[in-house]
């Protein structure tokens, strides 16, 4: 356990006074930190020989692959001639199908056709979003060790696949498309993920790449990749752009500045469970209710009927982007009854209006986080097939006071295009040597300190990769081990944030509290993957943890809740912080006085003086024990001032008797960093 304890009372100590020497020994080392923000392999001489590196947009509903060759970026078509490939995997009695072939037989083989796997990857089975999603999936999802597994029948036998395996199959398909085009083997790739994918989801995506035989060199946020596609030809004046990425299953918004080939992410927000699939589900539910009302038949329990309805609902949604009404016709839909209904654009918009409006909240958030106004935005870039919906465009343009969104890039292909450019940077392709990508992390990362306080090491919207270190110490005398509890979130107290993982550093040499120095380092790489280490500065012993994909990171609902609650309860959080800091400062000060009086100063103090100081120490410790939960920050500060007033003259006299040449006692010194934070 850590405690964030910093002294608000400084002692101006003569260099010859033993008491001041003691304090000098336990003064904190200045916090060290480095932030390597301008990172992305930049020039040809910096890259390894990876061969041709491909860029893959691994989407919820569709995936896309691109490659940079001879300075030009190509979006590659599959064997059907399509430049986007359905993220579907299906098993028949004879074979495994991936892409268009799998999607085309989904209605007739719903139990063995897997889609929307991106909504399960990197999440635990008991995650509320997983539980919500599996209710609407026709295939079976089972629980194994609190991890979702997909169960299908393969050649007459039950077979279970992890989301990583299924995603690996889709990545393998993209790899094959690239190899067919290039005529050679491909081993390295850049893969995109939603900006709000957490560490577990990113790790799982890298694992999927390994399953597909791909070394994923870089995980790039989807809106950032789209910004590269949009901004390659805008290399002079600075542009502030909003990338609005509404895909099949996820939604991201990023605010970037582009100038002289530098793409800097200012802020990012989003929802990993919002997209075209949700709009489809609204239609499916609407049509199922209409059918039940007309025929008194519930089709929701019939997987084949629901798969047919889903297929036609998606077609209807797409057609309504270019026309105002469409008709859904399904022969022998259920129990031999045909299905026939008309859907207008107005009805589609009515059913989904709440979801459309929900996308504006992250837009407001990135503006607030970056400190910019609507008027400061130069361009709005639309990414993802769902941005073709007229109502979505209308709401977004209205939000920006009538500013028209840019339609200069294909929303289905922009992310893969940007990924291919980044791949070209890594493989040393000509023409992209000067591109620099500055991305950010989505949530604050920190550790628990005494009192359950969240002590941040890497703040939200920090440019990545980055590395930050801070010195901590022990919370009790002769503490032999410390447990490092790693959290993500925006609240002041760890109970309101999400635990990512923990580990223990043991065999610390016995010493009074506050003396050992434990250096904790957070390293967040360019893929957004976190490694935490702790080193005992005395012995050199070190332990570390990489937050891996089995740690159960946050769902998007949790992320949204954290940010909203952080804003809503900002005053409460500030009060908690102030109270905790004041309590820790007072308690630390009392213990240091106690240890000093019983230690080096014991031989030079009068017994009466020593007794007086220790009486004050014991009275203060008793007060702390009785009042820590109920006292406010002001109470701790008052007790601190009273304690200091009582003991300071006595300690100053002891220092003077030791041979202080200055004859000075103690003076207030504006120094908030007298003591190390404690473990």
Swiss-Prot record:
Cellular component GO terms held in the UniProt record: endoplasmic reticulum lumen
Binding site for ATP: 59-62, 118, 248-250, 314-321, 385-388
Principal subcellular localization: endoplasmic reticulum
Segments of skewed composition (Acidic residues): 665-679
EC number: 3.6.4.10
Signal peptide location: 1-43
Reaction catalysis annotation: ATP + H2O = ADP + phosphate + H(+)
Family listed: Belongs to the heat shock protein 70 family.
Identification of the protein by name: Endoplasmic reticulum chaperone BiP
The species this protein was found in: Kluyveromyces lactis (strain ATCC 8585 / CBS 2359 / DSM 70799 / NBRC 1267 / NRRL Y-1140 / WM37)
């Amino acid at each position: 356990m850590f405690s964030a304890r910093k002294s608000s009372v400084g002692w101006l100590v003569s260099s010859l006074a033993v008491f001041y020497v003691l304090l000098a020994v336990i003064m904190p080392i200045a916090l060290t930190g480095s932030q390597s923000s301008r990172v992305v392999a930049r020039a040809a001489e910096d890259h390894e020989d990876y061969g041709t590196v491909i860029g893959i947009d691994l989407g919820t509903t569709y995936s896309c692959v691109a490659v940079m060759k001879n300075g030009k970026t190509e979006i590659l078509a599959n064997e059907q001639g399509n430049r986007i490939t359905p993220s579907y995997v299906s098993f028949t009695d004879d074979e495994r199908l991936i892409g268009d072939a799998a999607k085309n037989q989904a209605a007739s083989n719903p139990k063995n056709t897997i889609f929307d796997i991106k909504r399960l990857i990197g999440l635990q089975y008991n995650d509320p979003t997983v539980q919500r999603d599996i209710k609407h999936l026709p295939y079976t999802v089972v629980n194994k060790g609190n991890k979702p597994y997909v169960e299908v029948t393969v050649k007459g036998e039950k077979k279970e696949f992890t989301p990583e395996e299924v995603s690996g199959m889709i990545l393998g398909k993209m790899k094959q498309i690239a190899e067919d085009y290039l005529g050679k083997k491909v081993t390295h790739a850049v893969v995109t993920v939603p900006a709000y994918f957490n560490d577990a989801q990113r790790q799982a995506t890298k694992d999927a790449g390994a399953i597909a035989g791909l070394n994923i060199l870089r995980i790039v946020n989807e809106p950032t990749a789209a910004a590269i596609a949009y901004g390659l030809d805008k290399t002079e004046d600075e542009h502030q752009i909003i990338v609005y990425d509404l895909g099949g299953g996820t939604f991201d918004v990023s605010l970037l500045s582009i100038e002289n080939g530098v793409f800097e992410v200012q802020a990012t927000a989003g929802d990993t469970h919002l997209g075209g699939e949700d709009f489809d589900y609204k239609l499916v539910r609407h049509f199922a209710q209409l059918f039940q009302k007309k025929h008194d038949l519930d089709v929701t329990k019939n997987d084949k009927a629901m798969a047919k309805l889903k297929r036609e609902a998606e077609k209807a949604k797409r057609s309504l982007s270019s026309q105002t009404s469409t008709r859904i016709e399904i022969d022998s839909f259920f129990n031999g009854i045909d299905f026939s209904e008309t859907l207008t654009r107005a009805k589609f918009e009515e059913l989904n209006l709440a979801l459309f409006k929900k996308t504006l909240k992250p837009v407001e958030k990135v503006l607030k986080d970056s400190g910019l106004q609507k008027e400061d935005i130069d361009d709005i870039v639309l990414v993802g097939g769902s941005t073709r919906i007229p109502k979505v465009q209308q709401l977004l343009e209205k939000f920006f006071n009538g500013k028209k969104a840019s339609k200069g890039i294909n929303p289905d292909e922009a992310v893969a295009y940007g990924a291919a450019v980044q791949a070209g940077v890594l493989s040393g392709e000509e023409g992209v040597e000067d591109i620099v990508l500055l991305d950010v992390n989505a949530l604050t990362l920190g550790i628990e300190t005494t009192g359950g306080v969240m002590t941040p090491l890497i703040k939200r919207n920090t440019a990545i990769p980055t590395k930050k270190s801070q010195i901590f110490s022990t919370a009790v005398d002769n503490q032999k081990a410390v447990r490092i509890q790693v959290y993500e979130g925006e609240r002041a107290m760890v109970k309101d944030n999400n635990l990512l993982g923990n580990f223990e550093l043991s065999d610390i040499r016995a010493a009074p509290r506050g003396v050992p120095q434990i250096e904790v380092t957070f390293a967040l790489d360019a893929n957004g993957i976190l490694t935490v280490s702790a080193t005992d500065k005395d012995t050199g012993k070190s332990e570390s943890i990489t937050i891996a994909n089995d740690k159960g990171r946050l769902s998007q609902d949790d992320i949204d809740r954290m940010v909203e609650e952080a804003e809503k309860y900002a005053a409460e959080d500030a009060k908690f912080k102030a109270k905790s800091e004041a309590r820790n400062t007072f308690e630390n000060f009392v213990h240091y006085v106690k240890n000093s009086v019983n230690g080096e100063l014991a031989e030079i103090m009068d017994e009466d003086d020593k007794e007086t100081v220790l009486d004050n120490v014991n009275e203060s410790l008793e007060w702390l024990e009785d009042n820590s939960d109920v006292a406010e920050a002001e109470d701790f500060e008052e007790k601190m001032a009273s304690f200091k007033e009582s003991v300071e003259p006595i300690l100053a006299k002891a220092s003077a008797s030791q041979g202080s040449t200055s004859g000075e006692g103690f003076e207030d010194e504006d120094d908030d960093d007298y003591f190390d934070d404690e473990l």
